[in-house]
Amino acid sequence: MARKTPIERYRNIGISAHIDAGKTTTTERILFYTGVNHKIGEVHDGAATMDWMEQEQERGITITSAATTAFWRGMAGNFPEHRINIIDTPGHVDFTIEVERSMRVLDGACMVYCAVGGVQPQSETVWRQANKYGVPRLAFVNKMDRTGANFFKVYEQLRTRLRANPVPIVIPIGAEDTFTGVIDLVKMKAIIWDEASQGTKFEYADIPAELQASAEEWREKLVEAAAESSEELMNKYLETGTLEEAEINAAIRQRTIAGEIHPMLCGTAFKNKGVQRMLDAVIEYLPSPIDIPPVDGTDDDGNEVQRRADDSEKFSALAFKLMSDPFVGQLTFVRVYSGVLKSGDTVYNPIKGKKERIGRILQMHANNREEIKEVLAGDIAAVVGLKDVTTGETLCDIDAHVTLERMEFPEPVISQAVEPKSKADQEKMGLALSRLAQEDPSFRVRSDEESGQTIISGMGELHLEILVDRMKREFGVEANVGKPQVAYRETIRKTCDEVEGKFVKQSGGRGQYGHVVLKVEPLAPGGGYEFVDAIKGGVVPREYIPAVDKGIQETLPAGILAGYPVVDVKVTLFFGSYHDVDSNENAFKMAGSMAFKEGMRKASPVLLEPMMAVEVETPEDYAGGVMGDLSSRRGMVQGMDDMVGGGKIIKAEVPLAEMFGYATNLRSLTQGRATYTMEFKHYSEAPKNVADEVIAARGK
């Protein structure tokens, strides 16, 4: 089947922002102007098209990134039809994983900022993730109609806080309730949208006289940014003092795709102004799948290979999101990097080493769906009926294996026990939890051997709350939830040069004999676990060495202090002995485990606790109280910044154990006027009094 839209007219973009910057409303307007939605869905009344889970509509926040396809010909109908796949990403910090996994499959992003709030804490997290995956992006300053809106202050913050290089393509006409439109610096015309048509019609007008000087100054900056793209353009600019419209657009496009600059636009999505011009900028400046480098992967032998965005290449795709759908069951969202995927095809999952048959293929429009026969290179779609595919895995051609880069997922920092309310719910709960864990790699489920309880772990209180809520709504499972528990870790501080483990049972008949000598030493934070085989002269036979490693690894999940997982240790096996008849794998496994436990005791074991990066936005009057409160929670205040619309941002590092119930506390401290975000930073050694309490509580 020939392409309806050539690949150079595809745009895979993410819309990403801090909570409350108006991202979902912006996406709604995009869907409206691209002719998909005929009545605009408002977040205010819980009817936004992109936010399709019940909890999202109730809470007014976006949790899952729905992928939607839309078409655009330019606000003046001046482009050939372009196909835009939009991935809506959540702005709440507990859902950073969603942002991370969508960044992996995007070609470009539109970052939405609030004209009053400016660059907020989550904006910085999202910006870092976009840097990590090298995503070209543009900035849209929303809510220009709000009191305190200031486009130029946000411009400064993008430069200072994010170290971005913003280049305004438009500047606002007025602000707050006098915001009437924008000045297009490329055309040097004012754009005024027609309110009666909800902004679908507009007209170009002359620049208001009082803004002429400002417009010329910003136009100069735009043309300079364009001229810097090549020596040829720079020479022309120096000779003539100006550049053609087509030259400016081509140069800004080139520099945006290279990540050197970030085009900046503004408007108010709620009042139907500015999103239309931003959509034009998506087409003019953001890359198509063929404007970015081919995707890297490895073949079965570990050699590096590349896949180009071309239908004639062998098929490869990345599964970037799983969702349970009430009508069709499990949906797997895939980004096709090369080749073509047809329904009925059999493909290969190299991570699991299994074949998968492709059932129906759906193109999603928020919560509507259209069945299609095939997905071409560069496109995004949802596949029904995959049996065993997890987020971040590759699907590829059966005869041309490739593993695309794995995504990295963070370790959970908070745990809770869950119990079904009735016997009947027991089995259903197991099924529900495993389905949810498959969809969300930052959510883990395990069974506590001692208490027999089911423990769920995630990225924050809200994260777990929403998953328990989904269990009830989607699977009909009622559960009681225990108090949140901190995910502590254990490690060592000193090196134990020699520790012995001997497992001997010899009382007639076939006995057991395993004897090892280990060196146990600490690794740098994040080092995990390392096992070194330094046996010389066969004192421990080759075939038993993996058993020693296995014995140690089986000890790692429960440390000697309080039974928490052990991290950042290196173990070297350098001596031991064996018995011709009585030695076996099990004996060496036991010996390894015994020696390691003893080694930990001798190597100054310590308890590690998760430290969180906490950022609080508060009116200035309450800043002192907020800082005092954070200090009383063993927090280290690391700095304070000014917000665009007044107020302060306080940055601190606080142990997670001290942050439970913080939302309620902050509300009463600031009369509900402050907000905060929190994300995991690193593990750090818990003070002795804290460690003693935790160990005593676990020992009960």
UniProtKB/Swiss-Prot annotation:
The lineage of its organism: Bacteria, Pseudomonadati, Pseudomonadota, Betaproteobacteria, Burkholderiales. Residues 8-290 form the tr-type G domain. This is Elongation factor G 1. One of its GO terms (molecular function) is GTP binding. Its main location: cytoplasm. The keyword Protein biosynthesis applies. Catalyzes the GTP-dependent ribosomal translocation step during translation elongation. During this step, the ribosome changes from the pre-translocational (PRE) to the post-translocational (POST) state as the newly formed A-site-bound peptidyl-tRNA and P-site-bound deacylated tRNA move to the P and E sites, respectively. Catalyzes the coordinated movement of the two tRNA molecules, the mRNA and conformational changes in the ribosome. GTP binds at residues 17-24, 88-92, 142-145. The keyword Cytoplasm applies. Coiled coil: none annotated. Keywords: Cytoplasm, Elongation factor, GTP-binding, Nucleotide-binding, Protein biosynthesis. It is found in: Cytoplasm. PROSITE patterns: G_TR_1, G_TR_2. GO terms for cellular component: cytoplasm.
